């Protein structure tokens, strides 16, 4: 069953929040699908930034305004907790009068992330926490698998019950 489940309700919540806020933060534990769902909102491949990539992080660290400020549409920044000094730049970009870009930022809940959101992005960001699958996402027909394997996506989506152990 190693397919990706669509998280329709979560996608709808992100889309709705993008209509009302310039920034949507998608937070959660490792491997719950933050990156996968956030990337679906990027206007194009050039609007996706993964801050675990050292070259990307270095470029955004040196000149975030020139890189992000020129973009229009929805920009996705993954693992944003890796570059906390980006939060003030996001605040400036979110406050632009014409607001040509909206941002979906994702990352693991960390002190840097919480501090950055609380100090720099207050009033500009909607925060959504992602957890494991729920019954509506897994499907009622899979209730036993959800009960046996748990809600953590890698475990639930493993090919076999034995493969799901320890994931």
Where are the predicted features?
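Phosphate-binding site recognition
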Residues: 1-167
């Amino acid at each position: 069953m190693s397919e990706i489940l669509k998280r329709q309700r979560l996608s709808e919540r992100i889309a709705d929040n993008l209509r009302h806020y310039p920034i949507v933060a998608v937070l959660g534990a490792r491997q719950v699908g933050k990156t996968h769902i956030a990337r679906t909102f990027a206007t194009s491949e050039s609007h996706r930034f993964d801050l675990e990539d050292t070259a990307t992080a270095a470029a955004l660290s040196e000149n975030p305004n020139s890189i992000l400020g020129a973009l229009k549409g929805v920009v996705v920044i993954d693992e944003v907790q890796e570059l906390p000094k980006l939060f003030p730049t996001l605040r400036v970009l979110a406050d632009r009068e014409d607001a040509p870009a909206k941002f979906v930022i994702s990352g693991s809940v960390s002190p840097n992330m919480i501090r950055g959101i609380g100090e720099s992005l207050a009033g500009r960001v909607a925060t959504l926490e992602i957890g494991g699958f729920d019954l509506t996402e897994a499907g009622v027909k899979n209730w036993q698998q959800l009960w046996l394997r748990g809600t953590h996506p890698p475990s639930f989506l493993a090919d076999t019950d034995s493969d799901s152990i320890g994931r």
